Amino acid sequence: IQERYANRLDVKGQDFLRRIVRATQRLDQLLTDILDLSRAQRMDPPVDDIDAEQLVHEVLRRLEKRIKETDARITIRSPLPRLRVNTTWAIQGIYNLVANALKFASAGQAPDIEIAPHSGMDLEGNELIGLVVRDRGPGVAPEQRDRIFELFRRAVGREIEGTGAGLAIVRQVAERHSGRAWVEPREGGGSEFFITFGVNQSSPRKVQR
């Protein structure tokens, strides 16, 4: 419709048509994200033993156009760990974190992103290993640091287009691998987004909320 009729419309009509196209694109992305979240809840057991650096480079390959458009600086703090994961979903989780960092850069500044290894323990003493994605964006207020991982929830004041499902998918991916996903403030400004996976796991964990 846009290609066929755009030249026949006045300025007001063309603006209205552009709004329809943008709304359709947002709806399409929303449906895609909902399907991704549903699939993540039913993902296959983590059967792949893989170097996290391979996952990160695949994510950066997929985001290459956006990285160039934003003139982003990406730093990888090697060595990154080996992970036992479902590769498809681990890539999706890391992709969403890096895409989020690209999207929420501070106004007027090129994104400055660092990807580094992270290890720790959960509350039950189980070993976790994964990645942290650091940015120099506006940060996340303390009261919003958990809610942004809920479906369709976004930080108040972040007036940037999106479906509000990306971080919910990250959390689902982490938890289905007996891990965690969370955010902390970064020293000097910005945020640190973590995605971790259980070291000793044989199948995804079903998380009850």
Regions found by a protein language model. Name each.
Residues G166, V170:
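Short alpha-helical Gxxx[C/S/T] motif in the catalytic ATP-binding
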Residues P46-R61, E114:
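A conserved beta-strand-to-alpha-helix junction within the catalytic ATP-binding
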Residues S178-E184:
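Glycine-rich ATP-binding loops of the HATPase_c
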Residues A101-A105:
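Short helix-loop "hinge" at the ATP-lid/N-box region of the Bergerat-fold HATPase_c
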Residues K65, P138-G139:
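Glycine-rich G1-box
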Residues V140-F152:
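Short conserved segment of the HATPase_c
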Residues R22-L27:
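Short alpha-helical segment of the dimerization/phosphotransfer core of two-component systems
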